Amino acid sequence: GSEMCIRDRFDLERAWNLPLPSAPVRVKECASCRFWALCEQELVAADDISLFLPGDRAKPFRERGITTVQALIDAHLGEPSRLAAAWRAGEVLLRRGGVHVPRADIEVDVDMEAYLDQGAYLWGAWHDGEYFPFVTWEPLGGRAEAENFAAFWRWLMDLRAQAHAEGKTFAAYCYSAHGENHWMRMSAQRFGEVDELEVEEFIASSEWVDMFAHVKSSFAGPYGLGLKVVAPEAGFAWPEEDFDGEESVNARREALAGDHNARQRLLDYNCGDVQATRAVREWMDAGAPGTTAL
C-alpha cells in the first residue's frame, strides 16, 4: 500500500513540475470543443503542424524540429510532405499510380446498418439500378432480425447462383467490410438460419470485394479515405448531408417507436451509401479522372 502511495505521489509531483504547454495543439476532441474557434486562430497564425497532423501523429516530425505545415512540405520527406502540400492546396485525393478495381458481369453493392451492438436491422443492396432494402423495425435479437438476415442472404446467394448458372461473373461490394463481416458471422451463429460455413466461404471468396481496400491501395489523401470523403470526388452527393453516427442512432430509436419519417431517412441514407460505393467503383474503373498523381 505505502509503496503505491509513494509512487502515486512521485507521479503527481512529476506532473506538477512539467512545464505547462503555452500554445494549443489540435487533437481529435477539438472538433466538439467550444474553444476551438479561439485555438484555431492561434494555430493558423503559427501554421502549426497539428492542423494537418493532430495529436501524436505529428510527434515524429516535431522530434525532428518540424513544427509547421510549411516546414513539413519543405522537408521533402516523400508522402508525408506531399500530403501536407495537398492538404494546404485542398486536394482531397492523390493517385498512387495505376488505379485498379475488380469488375463483374453481375454486381451488387451492399451496406449494413447495425444498432449499437444489439444487431443488424438493415441490409441494403443496390443491383441493376434498383435499391433492395431488407429491414426490420422490430426489437433486435429475435425472430424478426433472424428472418430479415435470412431473407437478405437467400436473395444474395440466389443472385450469385443464377450468375454462375448463366456462366457470368459475380461480385458483391461494400465499403470497409469489417462491420458487414462481423454481423454476417454473428447472424449465422446467433440464429442458425444461415449456414456458418457458407458465410465463411463467401467472405473469403474473391466475389466479396472490399472497395475500401482498393481505394487505400490506389490513393492517399490528407483528409482520410472514408466513403464520405471519396464519393464526392467521384461526383456523388448524398440526398441528405451530415447524417452522422449519433443522428442515425437517434433515428433508429425513433424508427423503432414507429416514426415513419425516421424510417425513411434511414432507408434513404443507406440507399445513398450503396449508390456511393457503386459511383466510386465506376469512377475508379474510368481511371479516377480529376485526381493528381502522388
Q: Could you describe each region identified by the protein language model?
A:
Residues G1-I6:
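Short, small-residue-biased leader/transition segments that mark boundaries at the very start
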Residues D48-A104:
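N-terminal accessory regions of nucleic-acid-interacting proteins
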Residues D8-A46, V230-L294:
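Acidic, Mg2+-coordinating catalytic module of metal-dependent nucleases/exonucleases
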Residues R190-D242:
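Activity-critical C-terminal alpha-helical subdomain
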Residues Y115-Q118, G141-G142, G179-W183, R190-F191, ...:
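Flexible loop/turn segments at secondary-structure boundaries
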Residues R95-E166, R190:
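Conserved RNase H-like, two-metal-ion catalytic cores of nucleic-acid enzymes
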Residues G167-H178:
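Short glycine-rich phosphate-binding loop at a beta-alpha junction
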